[in-house]
Every structure is written in structure tokens, then in C-alpha cells.
């Protein structure tokens, strides 16, 4: 399947801990290199705790902060890319469906041509309930 190079991309990542913390920098770099309109939304309701420092992509200065916010601010600052974060656990299907709903973009400021963004859902969570939620969303979208 081919997509036009100017078609926008939205990546929604659930989980910013052990897996998401290491996936996020690669997603940021990929979106930055693609050179197309992109949105990256990181979702996690957890905070950085001392036990996370040994195995997750956080430093002591991050302690007590929301994991999604830390990653969004760290990499968007470095790469100059606007990023959104949701400092909550996504536990209900309507909330997830709202996040993955493709938005319509105007492709060029002087054109009436519009297109919907491609949406990628990354499940970087460590619990089966959220994995099942992603499965439900996949079949309903």
C-alpha cells in the first residue's frame, strides 16, 4: 500500500515506561526525518519513581513527574517537533477511539485540498486489559 508523501501521520503511543520510554525517541526521529505533517501523542498516567531509573529511560531529575510529559517535552525540545501528551491511563474504549480518530488536514495553505491523517497505534503497555482495549479499537475503527 502506498501513501502520498504529503499525507499527515498521527502516532498514538500508549505507555511511556519500560517499553514506551525506549520506543519514543525512535518514533520522534522517524517522524522528524519523514518531513511530512505529523502528530505524536504519548499517553501514560504513571509517574517516574526511583525503581524506574534502573530499567527505564528516565534520569533522577524526572522523579515525581508524569512519564508521558517527560518524554514529550524531552524529545520535542531536542527535535523541535510539537508533541501532545495525555497524563492519564487510557482505560475506556471511547477515550481510545477519540484519540485514534483521524483528523482532517488542509494540505497546503493556498489550496482547498484536504486529507485525513494516517493513524498508528503503538501499544507499549505491560497489562493485558489495555492490550485488549487496543484490540477492540482496532476492530471498531
Label for each model-derived stretch:
Residues 1-141:
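Adenine nucleotide-associated cytosolic modules
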Amino acid at each position: 500500500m502506498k501513501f502520498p508523501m504529503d499525507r499527515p501521520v498521527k502516532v498514538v503511543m500508549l505507555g511511556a515506561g519500560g517499553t514506551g520510554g525506549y520506543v519514543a525517541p525512535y518514533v520522534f526521529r522517524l517522524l522528524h526525518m519523514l518531513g511530512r505533517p505529523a502528530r505524536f501523542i504519548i499517553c501514560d498516567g504513571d509517574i517516574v519513581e526511583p525503581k524506574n531509573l534502573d530499567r527505564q529511560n528516565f534520569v533522577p531529575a524526572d522523579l515525581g513527574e508524569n512519564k508521558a510529559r517527560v518524554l514529550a517535552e524531552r524529545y520535542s525540545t531536542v527535535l523541535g517537533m510539537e508533541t501532545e501528551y495525555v497524563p492519564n491511563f487510557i482505560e475506556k474504549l471511547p477515550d481510545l477511539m477519540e484519540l485514534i480518530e483521524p483528523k482532517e488536514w488542509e494540505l497546503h495553505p493556498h489550496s482547498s485540498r484536504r486529507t485525513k491523517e494516517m493513524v498508528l497505534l503503538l501499544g507499549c503497555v505491560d497489562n493485558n486489559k489495555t492490550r485488549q482495549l487496543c484490540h477492540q479499537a482496532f476492530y471498531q475503527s
